[in-house]
Regions:
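Alpha-helical bundle regulatory/interaction domains
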Residues: 1-40, 44-204
């Protein structure tokens, strides 16, 4: 994934801009860590090793990340920003899921290692919350729709279901089908009211 993707320019919130800040450097760190974790567990990696493999200084690393465990959380936010967060804005449901998972599947070993650490629990807490906030913003600010109790329920359920379901996809032995098929199945699980409302992007 490149740092110069099709970004949602209509909502320049500080937290979104923060995700994009120094994106090229951060992506270099992600790629370096993914390579290192092919042979070395995350807990045994040092920041010095990561910096050497990334071609950056320690000061540059700490300007980008609080610690090595923050790298996975940033990458998830970065991928979501150009993928599922664009559903209903610039992408359909299928396009959003496919773009997101096509990026994540490149880093299966990286996320498998990161998920073994207790620090990963902060990601567990943040992903569903961020997805709910984004879906609410999309409905309200992009489609100009009112948020009914039913829609809020559907958003809550979908965010939880996405978070629990999507990681299973990367188990090719359990689900020996194409990514395209998995994305289609995911689309079929989206509550119909929510699906119909956001499947047509407002920006192309």
């Amino acid at each position: 994934m490149q740092a110069n993707g099709t970004w949602d320019k209509a909502l320049n919130k500080p937290e979104k801009l923060g995700i994009l800040s120094n994106a090229e450097t951060k992506l270099n760190v992600v790629n370096a860590m993914a390579d290192l974790m092919e042979t070395t567990p995350l807990e045994k990696l040092t920041v010095s090793q990561i910096c050497k493999a990334s071609g950056i200084s320690r000061s540059s690393f700490y300007r980008c990340f609080e610690d090595k465990y923050a790298v996975a959380q940033w990458h998830i936010q970065f991928v979501h920003l150009n993928g599922v967060d664009q559903i209903g804005r610039t992408l359909s449901w299928y396009e959003g899921y496919f773009r997101t998972e096509a990026d994540f599947v490149k880093y299966k070993r990286f996320y498998a290692g990161a998920s073994k650490k207790s620090d990963y629990n902060t990601i567990d807490e943040s992903i569903p919350r961020c997805r709910k906030e984004t879906l609410i913003e999309t409905i309200r600010d992009y489609h100009g729709k009112k948020l009914t109790t039913k829609l809020l329920f559907e958003i809550e359920a979908l965010a939880a279901m996405e978070f629990k379901t999507l990681p299973w996809w990367h188990d090719d032995a359990k689900y020996p089908v194409t990514l395209e098929q998995k994305c289609q199945w995911m689309c079929e699980l989206v509550p119909r009211d929510l699906f119909d409302m956001l499947n047509q992007p407002v920006i192309r």
